[in-house]
Amino acid sequence: YHSYKVLNTSEQEDVVSTQYVDMDGDILRYSPDGVSVVDNSMNTIWNETYTMQNPIADVNGSRAVVADSEGTSLYICDKKGVTGTVTTSYAIVKVRIASNGMVAVILDNDDNTWINFYNPDGSLVAENLTKIDDPGYPMDVAVSDNGVMMVTFQYVDGSKTTSYVAFYNYGDVGQNEDDRIVSGYTYENVVIPQVECISDSKYIALRDDGFSTYQGSQIPKESKTVLSLIHISEPTRHLRIS
């Protein structure tokens, strides 16, 4: 680009601690003091004040969640305002929101971790206690609009690092399964730090040696694994369904 045109300007006193994220054409603005949504002309659509030490956010379409990392408060919102608030019992590690407003949260109290699932109004759908040895420490979480939550766990067995990808179903399909886990895959000598929900029936796990994809709206199954060029052999995988 050789030139640009300024469309709008807005004064911001605390530019260091304020973050901006696109929110379906508008802008989500959040800081330790509060959250707001502004339009392209920088007109405030709504705002909410709070006190957080280290706010983090996740946006999916017209829905967003803002949480206090290592704190206990989170705000669920859409383009019209806050739809729900939650005060957790343990420290917040990570939050993810689906485009319908369902929220998944990883919590940690040093001894154990929890993965909680919330409605857009902040009411609790489910809470899952996880342990370091089984199924491991939750590294990341993704959530779809149809009530399926994807989690990647990591645990160490002797000198071997193992990752476990689990799919939880909070609809009718998962109600008779232990911990609502409808499918799961174990990957030996592999680290999976990130998972994503691409659609209601497509998921991806980003591995340190490539990536794996999964398909299925209710019971996702592994469909493909692509390894990077430096890994010529695929790790041993075992299907694990609780």
Q: How would you describe each model-predicted region?
A:
Residues H2-E11, N43-T49, G81-T87, L124-K131, ...:
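A short beta-strand motif characteristic of beta-propeller blades
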Residues K5-D33, T49-A57:
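Beta-strand-rich domains and repeat architectures in extracellular enzymes and scaffolds
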Residues P32, S69-G71, N100, D110-N112, ...:
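Surface-exposed loop/turn positions within WD40 beta-propeller blades
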Residues N40-S41, D78-K80, N119-G122, G171, ...:
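Short loop/turn segments that connect beta-strands within beta-propeller blades
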Residues T51-F153:
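Non-cytosolic head/periplasmic domains of membrane-anchored proteins
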Residues T72-Y75, N112-N116, G158-Y168, G210-Q215:
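Structural motif
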Residues N109, I132-D134, Y155-T162, G174, ...:
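Repeat-based scaffolding regions
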Residues I230-I241:
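Single conserved hydrophobic/aromatic residue that forms the stacking wall/gate
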